[in-house]
Amino acid sequence: MPERTSAHDPALLLFGSDNRYVSECQDCGGRVSNAAMMGANILKLKPVIELKDGQLICAEKIRGSDYRRLCIKLIREKLDAFPPDLQDVALVRTPGLEADICEAIEAELRQRGFQNVRWHEAGGVITAHGGPGVFGFAFSEIRRRYGRSLP
């Protein structure tokens, strides 16, 4: 019988950053070297930050210039990899995330069957470290009695 994990223990917490702002925010704060910033901008790389074992890590980098399409792609990949409990999904944004991107993200999640889709504004720490235009989401994964994911 599937059981829901606690809302305080999300299976996945992801943040993706629109690197149009990397040079303005992350470089100024010293979090990204000039070489890394230039390489990310040339290759159009956007970092995906995951919360694993209580630490924020750069799990992957996705490539492309259409941030809206990349956000939808990220959602699809993660929901396919981790079967979600379709009750709730929490979405986080920093100022600068365009309204059409927010609407596309919400439409994708509702189409996937999520019942409660809630947006939250990121606090000062996430905004200062990620910069404008950051999108994040968290959901609970459905697990079997012994902790294995459903097929």
Kindly give the residue locations of the regions a language model identified.
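Mixed-charge interfacial surface used for oligomerization/domain docking
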Residues: 1-151
